[in-house]
Amino acid sequence: MFDFDATLPVMALQFILLAVILNAVFYKPLSKVLDERAEYIRQTESGAKEQLAKTEALVQEYELQLSSARKQSQEIIAQAQAEAQKLASERVAAAQKEAIARKEAVAAEIAQQKEEAFRSLEGQVASLSRQILEKLLGPELVR
């Protein structure tokens, strides 16, 4: 049924030789390429994670700076509004003082003119009274 001749050892030797050749020519270079590719992927992933961490740190820093800048701008705006309010209040107070001073000056001038008018009229009252009496009674009776 089975013949044991040199065919079986030759076939075994061919199989071993083929395995050694395939290992040297195909499997080792292929596993080397796969290992290099896996290492490249690990390095790239590690670099990407580092870049992501740096980017997130920069984003946090910029957000902090932006928040600080917003706070400063709000403080500057509040300060400017307070200054404007103070300046407006000072101007209103100055205008009120000026209006009061003008009012008092006009009132004093009116009072002075009133006094002058009364003095002028007092002088004329005597003269007019005399003229009225002369017209009513006649010039001979009034003296």
Curated annotation (Swiss-Prot):
<dbReference type="InterPro" id="IPR034679">
    <property type="entry name" value="ATP_synth_b"/>
</dbReference>
<keyword id="KW-0066">ATP synthesis</keyword>
<keyword id="KW-0813">Transport</keyword>
<comment type="function">
    <text>F(1)F(0) ATP synthase produces ATP from ADP in the presence of a proton or sodium gradient. F-type ATPases consist of two structural domains, F(1) containing the extramembraneous catalytic core and F(0) containing the membrane proton channel, linked together by a central stalk and a peripheral stalk. During catalysis, ATP synthesis in the catalytic domain of F(1) is coupled via a rotary mechanism of the central stalk subunits to proton translocation.</text>
</comment>
<dbReference type="GO" id="GO:0046933">
    <property type="term" value="F:proton-transporting ATP synthase activity, rotational mechanism"/>
</dbReference>
<keyword id="KW-0812">Transmembrane</keyword>
<comment type="function">
    <text>Component of the F(0) channel, it forms part of the peripheral stalk, linking F(1) to F(0). The b'-subunit is a diverged and duplicated form of b found in plants and photosynthetic bacteria.</text>
</comment>
<protein>
    <recommendedName>
        <fullName>ATP synthase subunit b'</fullName>
    </recommendedName>
</protein>
<feature type="transmembrane region" description="Helical">
    <location>
        <begin position="6"/>
        <end position="26"/>
    </location>
</feature>
<comment type="similarity">
    <text>Belongs to the ATPase B chain family.</text>
</comment>
<comment type="subunit">
    <text>F-type ATPases have 2 components, F(1) - the catalytic core - and F(0) - the membrane proton channel. F(1) has five subunits: alpha(3), beta(3), gamma(1), delta(1), epsilon(1). F(0) has four main subunits: a(1), b(1), b'(1) and c(10-14). The alpha and beta chains form an alternating ring which encloses part of the gamma chain. F(1) is attached to F(0) by a central stalk formed by the gamma and epsilon chains, while a peripheral stalk is formed by the delta, b and b' chains.</text>
</comment>
<dbReference type="GO" id="GO:0045259">
    <property type="term" value="C:proton-transporting ATP synthase complex"/>
</dbReference>
<dbReference type="InterPro" id="IPR002146">
    <property type="entry name" value="ATP_synth_b/b'su_bac/chlpt"/>
</dbReference>
<dbReference type="InterPro" id="IPR050059">
    <property type="entry name" value="ATP_synthase_B_chain"/>
</dbReference>
<dbReference type="Pfam" id="PF00430">
    <property type="entry name" value="ATP-synt_B"/>
</dbReference>
<keyword id="KW-1133">Transmembrane helix</keyword>
<dbReference type="GO" id="GO:0031676">
    <property type="term" value="C:plasma membrane-derived thylakoid membrane"/>
</dbReference>
<keyword id="KW-0793">Thylakoid</keyword>
<dbReference type="GO" id="GO:0046961">
    <property type="term" value="F:proton-transporting ATPase activity, rotational mechanism"/>
</dbReference>
<keyword id="KW-0406">Ion transport</keyword>
<keyword id="KW-0472">Membrane</keyword>
<keyword id="KW-0138">CF(0)</keyword>
<keyword id="KW-0375">Hydrogen ion transport</keyword>
